[in-house]
Amino acid sequence: MAAARPARGPELPLLGLLLLLLLGDPGRGAASSGNATGPGPRSAGGSARRSAAVTGPPPPLSHCGRAAPCEPLRYNVCLGSVLPYGATSTLLAGDSDSQEEAHGKLVLWSGLRNAPRCWAVIQPLLCAVYMPKCENDRVELPSRTLCQATRGPCAIVERERGWPDFLRCTPDRFPEGCTNEVQNIKFNSSGQCEVPLVRTDNPKSWYEDVEGCGIQCQNPLFTEAEHQDMHSYIAAFGAVTGLCTLFTLATFVADWRNSNRYPAVILFYVNACFFVGSIGWLAQFMDGARREIVCRADGTMRLGEPTSNETLSCVIIFVIVYYALMAGVVWFVVLTYAWHTSFKALGTTYQPLSGKTSYFHLLTWSLPFVLTVAILAVAQVDGDSVSGICFVGYKNYRYRAGFVLAPIGLVLIVGGYFLIRGVMTLFSIKSNHPGLLSEKAASKINETMLRLGIFGFLAFGFVLITFSCHFYDFFNQAEWERSFRDYVLCQANVTIGLPTKQPIPDCEIKNRPSLLVEKINLFAMFGTGIAMSTWVWTKATLLIWRRTWCRLTGQSDDEPKRIKKSKMIAKAFSKRHELLQNPGQELSFSMHTVSHDGPVAGLAFDLNEPSADVSSAWAQHVTKMVARRGAILPQDISVTPVATPVPPEEQANLWLVEAEISPELQKRLGRKKKRRKRKKEVCPLAPPPELHPPAPAPSTIPRLPQLPRQKCLVAAGAWGAGDSCRQGAWTLVSNPFCPEPSPPQDPFLPSAPAPVAWAHGRRQGLGPIHSRTNLMDTELMDADSDF
């Protein structure tokens, strides 16, 4: 997110410094060649005086004076101040042979008035050199203190062109401890700063060596019309982004019970970050807020914030915009990681994100905080009038590259990796396991793959645009600085040309940043926020708002409710103790157990449950199913661990073997069952009455399901007193306790000796049921079972 950058270079010259250029390197060329630049012919005496001044002064009459011919003053005013004496000499001015020429040079030097602090200290020096007091053929020499006072405030003169030889603080021209008449003159020290510089007394606002002047608050590289155009652009896209992200947040909150699921809820936090960021961008449109944010109290641009003597409005806007942006991009990485891991766990009961959500929050909120504190510590927050905000690296693009481009580039690499892996996982599930997917699940996978592809394309495109715009700024910033420098010098020409009646040039900035590039850069930032909000632009969102409206207005919602079978079974098992006391009660399901799709409906896969519809017959038999699954057991039945043998002392060890019955075996068993039924109708075999077990007493406990009328798989084995269970040999036999004559033995069942029977009837030959697993095995082998 780059905004317009002012062309601030390390070498912006003083506006009035062009005076030195117009002088033709004043003092140097004149002193070395002996040629004057003033108008009119030079007298031989004037040339001799200049030559004497340069080659070496004659022996001084005293420590603070030098012999020189005096001439009456033709101009009794020097730089706007009246001189208290009436005679002067041109001996000390190495670039002037006459008073007229010296007066013209002073006019050119007056361009330094645009550097207020330099102008305040250089006026006495210039008057003491160009129009010194001369009395009795003796000229006063300026003191060394007067010369040294100009070196600091006027450092830009030394840096740009260098001081002339006759203005260098040498002991022969500027002796120590001398008083000068000029030092008693009161000069007008109220200098001014030429546009685009403004006057300021705050040293932190001074621009480089131009003490007393700072860059104006409004970016000088753009016109007022361009400022207004950019502000309207930011207002439009900022408002659209804010409204889209706000709608997303409201949709999540309206159905928070179903929306608060990972990974979909991560989109809530991403949109929250971009919503807060858009608020930071739109804050400038409050009355007077933009100037308060990007401008200092002295009218200069905010640079190097935070500072102790300025308000915190700039820092607050920076924290809002930058922290929200960095948190949003980190949440994007977490989102792609959550998608990747969730897609890998499809079709299983494994919850890959369980226990990791706290680490997600720790990472996404702490990392941007560290970056924000680091930027504030190095004081690299700058304001920009075009964008209307404060951000990092407007002045120094290296900090912008390190704190903006580097994190975004890392996000692009890591997030892109997880996003591509997630799409590949979905494609693998769809192509390698087509028979395991219901039509609804396959449709969701296709929709999600398409949306992830579009989303990834937009994310990569926006990041690429951001990088391109920033590189455009980096590579052209030096050229913009040179163009701005020429513009400043041109403005100085206008200032000097007015009093000297020289031609006035037409000043304009030749090379400057493109406003279109700045708009494209901002579009990438706002477009990312809009793209994040599109995940809730689904039909499920319309249903959420419909239910919310009905709830708020008290209207009835005629939408058919869907309750997942898994939720009904879980609730039935949770109420098994109540069903034990009252087997006839019916289960009621409140609206809180009704499951709706969240706003991000495309990410809710359920490969194991192709349909969520529940028939009335299925719902009525939930309690029966609970009993058949062993959740409700009679109080007189003992429950022991699975596969724990409890054989009677006088019988062989028998127990049911858990096994999976293939469909072919079930068909065979069904046919055998039918044959046994037909045989019973012809010749029923009644068991002896003495072998019947006693009738159970009346009880409210629901009856256990009847065991199937078919052969059971029994493991039989015998061992001696010294043998252990593991040393014995086990064989699978058919249950010999059925009264019917057994048909020919199946080839897949081995033969074994039959143990002694103890009962007759449908449950004859079976030992006591010792565990819930036995109940479930019995149910599994029942061909008439619905579950």
From Swiss-Prot:
Compositional bias (Basic residues): 668-680
Segments of this protein annotated with the region Disordered: 30-60, 667-704
Extracellular side: 28-233, 284-314, 380-402, 473-524
Region (Required for interaction with PRKACA): 570-653
FZ domain segment(s): 65-181
Record-listed Phosphoserine modification sites: 556, 574, 590, 595, 638, 662
UniProt KW Transmembrane keyword: yes
Main location: membrane
Modified residues (Phosphothreonine): 593, 640, 644
Compositional bias annotation for Low complexity: 38-53
Subcellular compartments: Cell membrane; Cell projection, Cilium
Family the UniProt entry places it in: Belongs to the G-protein coupled receptor Fz/Smo family.
Entry protein name: Protein smoothened
